[in-house]
Amino acid sequence: MRPLFLIGLPGVGKSTIGRLVAERVELTFVDTDLFVESRYHASISSMVACCGIDKFRKRERAALLELLQAEDTLIATGGGLPIWEDNMDRMLANGLVVYLRSPLDLLAERLYTVRATRPAVAEKTHSEVRDYLESISEKREPYYSRAQVVVPIGHLRSAEEEREAAEQVIEAIRHHMEKEDA
């Protein structure tokens, strides 16, 4: 099976939902952020601080090019990966791209709660987190909207809600594959 890619804004649940989906349908799970950190023995924030965002994006792209060859793998991408160079084209050509989409207010609430673990929003107020998400959403939406599958994601406040979201993703993927086979 060709790779599945989960894309979406920060905080939408790509890693959380991705792990659950991969476990449920017996796929290997890869988070590109963790993959890049492991490969370069540094956190993303330290890579960006040291070498700049362009250098990080090049490393992220190299990881993507390697992962495009993966079989039976679900890949949760970094939020910005699809908009760099021709990454989205490559994902669409080599796998199934699933866009996890949530309302910005919901994402702002979620990100604000965990902001200490997210360098891009660590020092921001709730309002600034919302503004940040709106700004990056405007840039990324034209890329994200090209995904073959779009799944609306609601609250993820409990393990049960996370499992329900994972089931929604699985059903959306199944539905898409059935249409492709028809």
Which residue ranges define each predicted feature?
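Hydrophobic anchor at the beta1->P-loop junction of P-loop NTPases
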Residues: 6
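P-loop (Walker A) phosphate-binding loop of NTP-binding proteins
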Residues: 9
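ATP-binding Walker
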Residues: 12
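Walker A/P-loop
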Residues: 15
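NTP-dependent small-molecule kinase module
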Residues: 20, 24, 109, 138-182
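Post-Walker A helix-loop "phosphate-sensing" segment adjacent to the P-loop in P-loop NTPases
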Residues: 23-32
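ATP-dependent small-molecule kinase phosphotransfer cores
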Residues: 34-92, 117, 134
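A glycine- and Lys/Arg-enriched "phosphate-lid" helix/loop adjacent to the NTP-binding pocket
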Residues: 94-141
